[in-house]
Regions:
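Short, charged low-complexity linear segments at domain edges
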Residues: 26, 188-213
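Alpha-helix initiation and N-capping motif
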Residues: 43, 54-55, 166, 190, ...
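Cysteine-cluster motifs in flexible loop/terminal segments that predominantly coordinate metals
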Residues: 45, 52-56, 208-229
Length: 229
């Protein structure tokens, strides 16, 4: 997968629903936040970490931004625009037995120290809820790890903020004729999400320099390749 597929720029999505989780967290302003309850990271920070754990160290401990950040925001904005043109969202929701939805939801957790935006929160006939994400991409016979983990993190936040069961999620590939894939969300997935969030917080709060497996595929276009040792 490309680097642009692995990063979700969460602050160019426009107005939407915001869960009432306290003024000190604020909106999804594109950076992690310091609050009275500690550091609040973004879902996109977790996806950066999964791509390469050292991204977090360079961005937040050394305060070296990515030069590509603005380009990713432009790509995400284009993705949203193209998705709106290509997808019959009402038909899609009905096919998933959705009885109610909230769109473009900013959602956060002080307890878990994470925030982000969900394209849609679906409330289903069986009494559960599910996140739905739209990707301006083709389905490649598998769901990328970062795609799934984005949905797992969203499920974690939906469960806490809405006090509702979330055992699955959906991803719509708009360039594959709006193909929708269902992703199972397990207890193991949620525990792994909590573990990774804590690993990221340790890097930011303690200044830990993480080990990483060098990958020529990932490193060749990395904006930090000249300083990473």
């Amino acid at each position: 997968m490309t680097k642009s597929e692995s990063i979700i720029a969460e602050n160019d999505l426009g107005a939407g629903t915001q869960k009432d989780i306290g003024n000190d967290i604020g909106g999804d302003d594109g950076v992690y936040a310091e609050t009275d309850s500690g550091t609040i990271i973004r879902i996109s920070d977790v996806l950066e970490y999964l791509f390469c754990s050292r991204f977090i160290y360079y961005m937040y401990c050394l305060d070296i931004p990515q030069h590509e950040e603005k380009r990713f925001k432009v790509l995400k904005g284009r993705e949203v625009h193209e998705t709106r043109k290509l997808t019959n969202k009402d038909y899609l929701r009905r096919s998933l037995d959705c009885i109610r939805k909230e769109s473009n939801v900013f959602i956060a957790s002080k307890e878990r120290h994470i925030k982000g935006i969900v394209d849609e929160v679906l409330f289903l006939e069986d009494g559960t809820a599910a996140p739905l994400e739209y990707k301006f991409a083709e389905y490649k016979e598998k769901v990328f790890k970062t795609y799934k983990f984005q949905l797992v993190l969203q499920a974690l936040l939906i469960r806490e903020n809405y006090n509702i069961e979330v055992n699955r999620a959906y991803i719509c590939f708009t360039r594959s004729n709006s193909l929708v894939k269902e992703i199972e969300i397990t207890t193991t997935d949620l525990k792994k999400a909590d573990k990774i969030i804590q690993e990221i917080l340790d890097i930011i709060q303690k200044g830990l320099y993480p080990k990483t497996s060098r990958s020529s595929r990932k490193c060749v276009d990395c904006c930090y390749r000249n300083i990473c040792v």
